Amino acid sequence: MVLLSILRILLLWGLVLFMEHRVQMTQVGQPSIAHLPEAPTLPLIQELLEEAPGKQQRKPRILGHPLRYMLELYQRSADASGHPRENRTIGATMVRLVRPLASVARPLRGSWHIQTLDFPLRPNRVAYQLVRATVVYRHQLHLTHSHLSCHVEPWVQKSPTNHFPSSGRGSSKPSLLPKAWTEMDIMEHVGQKLWNHKGRRVLRLRFVCQQPRGSEVREFWWHGTSSLDTVFLLLYFNDTQSVQKTKPLPKGLKEFTEKDPSLLLRRARQAGSIASEVPGPSREHDGPESNLCSLHPFQVSFQQLGWDHWIIAPHLYTPNYCKGVCPRVLHYGLNSPNHAIIQNLVNELVDQSVPQPSCVPYKYVPISILLIEANGSILYKEYEGMIAQSCTCR
């Protein structure tokens, strides 16, 4: 049974990876893996698979400040096992770091140096609401023999300068940035002009730098500065899907299930002799207490699963599993649904061909994952229902 549970977990994760690959490769115009079988569109599996690149795609070489920023964000928001911290302050369940496409630099014009940056925006997903958008950039560039003072502004054709509104500057969130960097809120600009548009969307910004008076910045020094490491976009999302919770048992049924088991079974057998002309043999006991339904720890590394080419953190995943025999009387502490309680009575009294309730996870906790998407973006995301925390019979 343990091996079967493990194989089920690995199969589900395999389906997750496959479906995510198909969605991502379709969006970037690459073919999917032809030799993999078709997979069912289970909601959680489909959601996770929408983030991962194909296995044949090597992890993009993402170094420098974007990766350092997201690693620090992850460490502040989750522990080493991936459990979200209770005191996390990012105010979102998903953060996507988007790097610009290849930039276009204008010819030098006196002391001004301008680069046009395009940030591709993925299609909207109904399940996620954009709650914050910021641009992070270096406001001081230290080049050989000189330095530049820089800022980011919205791109407007034939406009020398067009600053964001002063109210959008700065950030009220705790900063993860060194002193040479600035994070600026551009939610109003993104939300009004781009986010609700259909089709391909690109956020175009200008990275404008000015050299001090009396200094000279040679053109080859400027072109040696990579905008991929000096400017990036951060998009913050919240999951809008409601999590369905198990309803508590009615008061009468709760009292019914908490009565003395022997008395309850005697009454049940009496009812069974009326309900069934040929009742089957009853179970005399539930077995040793160690065999009862309970939570068992289980851990696997993403490297073992072959997913370390796109998952940055954590390195280990502890899904856990439930195993054991469900007792004859499902007491209230097991949090079993009404259907399972009735099913157990039917198995005991009426027809043993009706299976007993199974030992399955009841409560889950999320896991935070930092990963690289197919297009090279870095994603922090909290996935619900990934770690079993308690068990029930149903």
Swiss-Prot record:
An annotated Gene Ontology molecular function: cytokine activity
Positions annotated as glycosylated: N87, N238, N375
Gene3D superfamilies: Cystine-knot cytokines
First and last residue of the signal peptide: 1-18
PROSITE patterns: TGF_BETA_1 (PS00250), TGF_BETA_2 (PS51362)
Keyword tags: Cytokine, Disulfide bond, Glycoprotein, Growth factor, Secreted, Signal
KW RNA-binding (keyword) present: no
Cystine connections: C293-C359, C322-C391, C326-C393
Listed GO CC annotations: extracellular space
Xref: InterPro entries: Cystine-knot_cytokine, TGF-b_C, TGF-beta-rel, TGFb_CS
Assembly with partners or alone: Homodimer or heterodimer (Potential). But, in contrast to other members of this family, cannot be disulfide-linked.
Assigned protein family: Belongs to the TGF-beta family.
Described purpose of this protein according to its UniProt entry: May be involved in follicular development. Seems to be an oocyte-specific growth/differentiation factor that stimulates folliculogenesis and granulosa cell (GC) growth.
Protein name: Bone morphogenetic protein 15
Originating organism: Bos taurus
